[in-house]
């Protein structure tokens, strides 16, 4: 099975070390463009663009990278409860059309009550997933070309429709990650690819089996992906030394503050990440070559595969054997590590190198009439 390898655009900051200004660098448009172009040339399938108040806006960043890349896809966040599904569907179709079919979407429900409150969202965990399920139903139906009337608990639309369809049919693929039962049920019923953070293989296997069974109950099959950091070097010793350097400027106070911030979230996935290290710096290799040091201060994906190219490739193939076909990777700093992964890891894997998409012809059209429909040629009798 050929593997889809994704990289990451660090719109929330970048540098050589975690938890310090030492070795940091400005993350401006030029730098993000360098990373995107490197990923494009090296054969990555796409890039994940993060979302949240600590990040630049993912949609604007993605749009700005379209003209400077050729085949790279952009995995961009959809935010239920923050955005109308109708507006989000129009945005998704436009991004897909402007990128010539290079748009992918990642459903992000949110987990930090403080950040959500700042965005005007005051739903609890179960309510957010109810809203996300309704959002996704409407979003998908619009992209499928339906005129949608929907009267749910959280979402209400009447006569919603898209005038301009996406390039990808039936619609651009939808990714999603969540560890709770309600999250897995949402994935099983509505998404195309289920993402997990980088837990040890036995825990990932358990999650995949759960989601696969739930999808089968809905008569569906879905794909699987995993989100990991990577520290790959020419030798295993060099890789482990690089891992230690990455957290060499962390102090106990910084770790404690980060863990306290993570503790206020209601994310089951974040709780599982924190349990891998319990905020302690010892015993961070939680599974062969799987290192939890990143999660001491970084929310979300908190584990890294560490080793030389063949070693990391072996660990990736272990995950692939569980049914995972997509790997969303990152490393610090992201420009240099994009090259290291491409040069030291890719030769040891069966990597699916994306082709440059051919321009898709769009039907000629006149201006929309009354902001309601596209004029069509009337058949002559």
From Swiss-Prot:
Checking SUPFAM superfamilies in the record gives: Bacterial luciferase-like (SSF51679)
Other known facts: FMNH(2) which is absolutely required for this enzymatic reaction, is provided by SsuE.
Q: Which family does it belong to?
A: Belongs to the SsuD family.
A Pfam family it matches: Bac_luciferase
What are the recorded GO MF terms, alphabetically? alkanesulfonate monooxygenase activity
**Which GO annotations describe the biological process of this protein?**
alkanesulfonate catabolic process
| Classification via InterPro entries | Alkanesulphonate_mOase_FMN-dep, Luciferase-like_dom, Luciferase-like_sf, SsuD_RutA_monooxygenase
User: Which Enzyme Commission numbers does its entry carry?
Assistant: 1.14.14.5
Q: What is its biological role?
A: Catalyzes the desulfonation of aliphatic sulfonates.
What is the protein's name according to its record?
Answer: Alkanesulfonate monooxygenase
Q: Which UniProt keywords apply?
A: Flavoprotein, FMN, Monooxygenase, Oxidoreductase
Q: What is this enzyme's catalytic activity, as reactions? A: an alkanesulfonate + FMNH2 + O2 = an aldehyde + FMN + sulfite + H2O + 2 H(+)
Q: What is the lineage of its organism?
A: Bacteria, Pseudomonadati, Pseudomonadota, Gammaproteobacteria, Enterobacterales
Subunit and partners:
Homotetramer.
């Amino acid at each position: 099975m050929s593997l889809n390898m994704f990289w990451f655009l660090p719109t929330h900051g970048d540098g050589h070390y975690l938890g310090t200004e030492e070795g940091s660098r400005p993350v401006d448009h030029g730098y993000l463009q360098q990373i995107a172009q490197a990923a494009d040339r090296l054969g990555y399938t796409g890039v994940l663009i993060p979302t949240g108040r600590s990040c630049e806006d993912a949609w604007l960043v993605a749009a700005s990278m379209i003209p400077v890349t050729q085949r790279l896809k952009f995995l961009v966040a959809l935010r239920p409860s923050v955005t109308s599904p109708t507006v989000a569907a129009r945005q998704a179709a436009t991004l897909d059309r402007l990128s010539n079919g290079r748009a992918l979407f990642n459903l992000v429900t949110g987990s930090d009550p403080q950040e959500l409150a700042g965005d005007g969202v005051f739903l609890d965990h179960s309510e957010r997933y109810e809203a996300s399920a309704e959002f996704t139903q409407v979003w998908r139906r619009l992209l499928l070309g339906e005129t949608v009337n929907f009267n749910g608990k959280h979402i209400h639309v009447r006569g919603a429709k898209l005038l301009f369809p996406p390039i990808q049919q039936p619609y651009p693929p939808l990714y999603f990650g969540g560890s709770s039962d309600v999250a897995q049920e949402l994935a099983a019923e509505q998404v195309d690819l289920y993402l997990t953070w980088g837990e040890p293989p036995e825990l990932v296997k358990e999650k995949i089996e759960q989601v696969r069974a739930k999808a089968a109950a809905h008569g569906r099959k879905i794909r699987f992906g995993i989100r990991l950091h990577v520290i790959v070097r020419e030798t295993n010793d060099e890789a482990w030394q690089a891992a230690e350097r990455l957290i060499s400027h962390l102090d106990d106070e910084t770790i404690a503050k980060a863990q306290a911030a993570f503790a206020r979230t209601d994310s089951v996935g974040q709780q599982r990440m924190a349990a891998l290290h319990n905020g302690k710096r010892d015993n961070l290799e939680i599974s062969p070559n799987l290192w939890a040091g990143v999660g001491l201060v970084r929310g979300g994906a908190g584990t890294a595969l560490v080793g030389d190219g063949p070693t990391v490739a072996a660990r990736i193939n272990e995950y692939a054997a569980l049914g995972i076909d997509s790997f969303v990777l990152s490393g610090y700093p992201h420009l240099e590590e994009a090259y290291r992964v491409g040069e030291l890891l890719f030769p040891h894997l069966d990597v699916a190198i994306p082709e440059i998409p051919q321009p898709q012809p769009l039907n000629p059209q006149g201006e929309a009439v009354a902001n309601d429909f596209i004029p069509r040629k009337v058949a002559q009798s």
